Amino acid sequence: MAVTGNLSPQWLEEQYRIWKATPEQLSDDWQAFFEGFDLAHQAPTVDRDLAAKASAVDSLIYRYRDLGHLVACTDPLSPCKQDHPLLNLAVFGLDEGDLERTFYPLRYPQQSATLREILDLLRETYCSTIGVEFMHIQDPDQRQWLKDRMETVRNRPQLNEPDRLDILRTLQKATLFEAFLHKKFLGQKRFSLEGGEAMIPLLECLVVHATSLGVTDVVMGMAHRGRLNVLANIFQKPLENIFAEFKDNLELAFVGDGDVKYHKGSSVDRKIDGNGSIHLSLAANPSHLEAVDPVVIGKCRARHIGYGPGGRKRVLPLLVHGDAAFAGQGVIAEVLNLSQVDGYQSGGTFHLVLNNQIGFTTEPAHARSTLYATDVAKMLMIPVFHVNGEDPEAVVHATQLALEYRQQFARDVVVEVICYRRYGHNEGDEPAFTQPLMYERIRQRPPLHEIYAERLIKDGVDPSQIKALEQETADTLELALEAEPVNQRDVGFQAKWAKVQREYTPDQPKTAVDAERLRTLTDKMTSPPATFHVHPKIAKLLERRREAVSEGSGIDWGNAEALAFATLLTEQVPVRLSGQDCRRGTFNHRHAALVDQENAQLYFPLAFLEKGQAPIQVYNSILSEVAVLGFEYGYSMETPEGLNIWEAQFGDFANGAQVIIDQFISGSGTKWDRSSGLVMFLPHGYEGQGPEHSSARIERYLSLCAEHNMQVAQPSSPAQLFHLLRRQVKVPWRRPLIIFTPKSLLRLPACTSTLDELADGRFANILQGPGDAAEIQRLLLCTGKVYYDLLAAKQDAKRD
């Protein structure tokens, strides 16, 4: 169609009318032109109702993923919920007439499906015996990862008959063990697992599956409920020894005060068919619920570091919580907060919440302000799996999925098993006094292994095979009752602790360091790279430190501490310092990390002393005492060769971690045969900052001292601190060391040391002041700041 010149609109309109009436009057080119014109302007016909329903289906799918857990059948004591107002079809503008209509939903496992098929998948995945909270997770990759693995199998495990029989066998072992103890040792406390027996196949599944995923170490912390069952069936503690403890005739492997049988720790190397072996460790713990949690995390962190790259996938922290404690104990939030903090990451902790729906006699409404006991964990944006404790297969599936998530994303994960407690808080308690209706329902529930056996029989498993498995377990228990206890190996001082001496001896090892060596190290740690922009005041501080060592006098507290660290690091002793603001130091005296004033990059002078030195770790901690001190205590249990220090911001605040001090630091040796070389720095002194910033309560720590369980010191000079820190790793034994550190003395000109005192001296329990001993008429015993106050008063009074 050749067009020359401009065409008037009027002419085009006339041609268009002709084409509409008699198109054959126009040329083929103009006919094609007007056909294209009309086609381009025809609005597509859209079924608005169908589009609205398609959008509604997408919203419905999202809502089930988000809220399906609210109607999941997870409580074995309550009828299953049938519906929820927010999941009703009418809310989305859908009705029964749409059930057979085919939809093409977005972000769904199948390209197309009827609404009925979509609902079936969603209800089976999110509303059966597993309820999942995961849509709060902000990372879309994590959400998609979970959806892909849940919806494709409808949240059901793919188990063959041998797998199911293995689950049954573990249930039988768990239930029959408790029944046997109840019968043979009537009235004795054991804090039965009955009602929550699903925990045993869960743990067995976790151990086996973890091994296949590359885990070599599982470090576990748990309270008393079900602990004996776990020791017997997961840690393979000899049944003979457990029964002997009930008979009170088991000889301890060490001399000490001991502890009740459901507080003791254990360890075992378990062989796993086809996957090698895995080391299991159960941390000893007191009755203080959840206090062991940060200890376990610290132990795992130390093992991660020890293994090097890839260590986080090899070591799995496993914490077993009760529902009331998980919601009620503040240490839970503190431990969760450590999860992704630099220097404290655990690689993801597996949290198992055994929810028996009661805390001693307290019901959930009085135990928490949230719908779920686990709601505090959502602060980490992690998935929470709620599982019916009477569906062991669902428990196994949730465990496998949760563990795979942890290995994939290095994040914490929570599995809550909702169950019940068949007896009272302990076996001598009558729960019907306070929960009569609940315990009437519980009395009607058969044991879980019987429920699951019936399920297998319905699916075609031979009943005689099930009976044979049960008889095998019963025979094993009877034989163990009559057998002699197995000799216990000395578990407290093995492996990395084998070279550590259990008994305390009054050693005074050589802690002095050659003066020339001290000068060399000082030059290195006070000379940052030329390209590093040091704050002018810090540059002057480094210069003063260098001059003090060079001139041989005026070595202050921060300088002596840094020299103690430096000498140990170059002697292959790793050093870790942790606490609030400890990199700089609360009182601006340390500066273990320098900050470039132009780009904010960090430089750690102690990390660049010489090639091949031991590593230095200095971390500002979260604002917590109990979790961080517990973490560092656990870390120290794995590193007897290192110097591990926790510093309180002020010594007054250490009582926020009193449970760690009382139950672990002061008592672990005599109770559990466990040692620690942890050092606590507690700033102490009346410097006019009020009653909460003045006293670390020396008297409290002294009252905890007995039978050489720990050391308490208040060094009065920088040289004394230098020797005390070095002595801590030079002695052949390990005991916690509490050091009351100064405040004003950090810059007091009189409180300095000479180079000779570092190069020739050693730690002394008693220091003699200046003056002629023959002229002394009055003797004053004092320490720390008091000495310098008295010295100044003496000088002012011009008294000798």
Where are these regions (language model features)?
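Subset of Sec-pathway N-terminal targeting signals
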Residues: M1-F37
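Conserved phosphate-handling catalytic cores of large alpha/beta enzymes
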Residues: G359-T370, K378-V414, I418-G424, A432
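Cofactor-binding active-site loop characterized by glycine-rich and histidine/acidic residues
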Residues: T216-M381, F385, F587-G642
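Extended, charge-enriched "interface" segments that sit outside catalytic cores
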Residues: F37-A198, V215
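Flexible, glycine-rich loop/tail regions that form catalytic "lids" or insertion modules at the edges
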Residues: A52-Y62, H69-F103, W145, V153, ...
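Alpha-helix capping and helix-loop boundary segments enriched in small/acidic/polar residues
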Residues: V3-N6, R48, R190-E197, H279-E290, ...
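Active-site cores of enzymes that catalyze phosphoryl transfer or operate on phosphate-rich substrates
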Residues: N155-F177, A244, D248-G308, P605, ...
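Active-site pocket-lining segments that scaffold enzyme catalytic pockets across diverse folds
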Residues: L176, F180-E240, E543-E547, I555-P574
